[in-house]
Amino acid sequence: MAHLLEQMAYIGDVPWHGLGNQLSANEPIEVWAQQAGMDWTICEAPVSFMTQDAASLGKIATFPENKVLFRSDTKMPLSVVSQRFQVVQPSEILEFYRDLTEVSGFELETAGVLKGGRKIWALARTGQSSTLKGNDVSNGYVLLATACDGTLATTAQFTSIRVVCNNTLAVALGASSGAVKVRHSTSFDAQAVKRQLGISVSTWSSFMYQMKGLSERKVKMHEAMNYLSRVFFDETKVGSDNASNRTTAKVMALFDGHGRGAELASAKGTAFGLLNAVTEFVDHERRARTNDHRLESAWFGQGASLKEKALEQALVMIA
């Protein structure tokens, strides 16, 4: 089975997905680039093809409307894109955090590449942290990710990680998704993205105010079942009823005391606990071919969408 993860680096404890090279704290950006497998560039070349006929070998022709992107180190192709496609280099993802780590107190915690270099990301802790009742701690992060295969715009996203279980949840505030997305048809301006994202205490405080509200909202069994039905509705339309029932039963078991931190006062019998049962299922329990497939889904794919839906439905309970 080929792995999605090409290379990755992290500090502190082994990440929940169990992948990567461990670094010491406060390593320079240059060390991160090497250890995270991000010390290469994305190169461009014309799309070429061989014309052939029965009488000859033909000749090399080009297709001017598109270009091939490939790695500078291995020369492996990454994708074919239009000429309008604006490349974001691996170094730009890490450089985004240079002033944040050197001046603003951020600390890089993980960075790496997926799918042979098609997806690139870095995650840094902001230094913001909040505690709900029962000593339930969540820390604030900013995730920056991009893809050169057309599957992901360059995205800067506020993210929270609950310490007791390492569940990840994208921060969303009202009409704002807590994210800034830059299409590859436009150039990536790191400083403009930071200004638009509004890396500030108020964003984190507003999010944790919502989480506090969820932790104080007690839920009854029928409410929990209705919530899970709404969250998993699109998934349960596909596949067998048995698979749907197993998913719901697994998440309900996590909520009902079997999940990490499920017995904390903030989570036991509350909407916050119900939300975290879904995020734990996506991050840790949901079936995946490999841990790197799980990471890909939880941060960028179907799992991320499922967690977003779970948050939306949870907030309805306290609206």
Language model feature labels by segment:
Residues 1-55, 127-319:
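Intrinsically disordered, low-complexity regions enriched in serine/threonine
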Residues 1-12, 97, 108, 113-121:
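Short N-terminal secondary-structure initiator segments
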Residues 59-84:
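A short, surface-exposed helix-loop junction/capping segment
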Residues 64, 117-118, 138:
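Short, well-ordered loop/turn elements at secondary-structure boundaries
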Residues 69, 122-124, 144:
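Generic structural hydrophobic/aromatic packing signal, biased to beta-strands
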Residues 83-107:
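Amphipathic alpha-helical segments
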